[in-house]
Amino acid sequence: VLFGETGVAQHLKPGTAVMVSSTIASADAQEIATALAGFDLEMLDAPVSGGAVKAANGEMTVMASGSDIAFERLAPVLEAVAGKVYRIGAEPGLGSTVKIIHQLLAGVHIAAGAEAMALAARAGIPLDVMYDVVTNAAGNSWMFENRMRHVVDGDYTPHSAVDIFVKDLGLVADTAKALHFPLPLASTALKMFTSASNA
C-alpha cells in the first residue's frame, strides 16, 4: 500500500505523518520508518488494542513511538481512535515491541481461559457458574471475560481468526529469540494456537 509502483508514499506531501497500526515486528516498523523518511515522510509506530467495539467507539488503546512532529501531526487521528495513547518513545519499533509483549499476555490468557473452561466442563462444573466465579474473582482478565463468554453461550461463530494469534505469538517468539529470553508459557500457547489452526 505504501511502497512500490502503485504505493501511496510517493504521492504524499513531504512532511506528512503516516500512522502504522499493524501488529508487526520492531525491525519491520524501523524499516518502514526508514523507507518513509526517503520520501520526507514521518512515521508513527502506533499499534492498537481494544477489539471491534472499542474501535467503533473511538476508545482504542494506542502504543505509539515516533517523533514529536509525528505525534503532533497525527493528534486529530489519535483523538478520534483512542481512549488512551501511550507515548513509548521517539524510536520507531518501540510501539511495536510493547504491542508484541501485550500480545504475549493476550494469547496466554485466551489459551489459559480455554483450558480452565475445558477442565470445568470435564469436572461437571456448569460453565456459566465457572464464568461468573472467574469474572468476579482475581483470576479474571479482559480476554477471559470477552472470549469465554462465547463458550458459555455456546456461540462458536468466528469473531476473530485463530491465525491472528499464530502470527502474533510467532512475533513474540521471534522477539524473545532475538533477546535470548525464554518464554515457556508463550511457547506453549503458540503450540495450542498452531494446533487449532491446523485442525
Predicted regions and their residues:
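Rossmann-fold dinucleotide-binding core
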Residues: 4, 14-18, 23-103, 107
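Helix N-cap / loop-to-helix initiation motif
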Residues: 25, 124-127, 182
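Glycine-rich, highly charged phosphate/nucleotide-binding loops
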Residues: 1-7
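Beta-strand segments within the central parallel beta-sheet cores of soluble alpha/beta enzyme folds
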Residues: 128-136, 187-191
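Active-site-proximal catalytic alpha-helix in oxidoreductases
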Residues: 57-65, 86, 92-123, 132-146, ...
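Interdomain hinge/lid region at the active-site interface
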Residues: 96, 105, 140-199
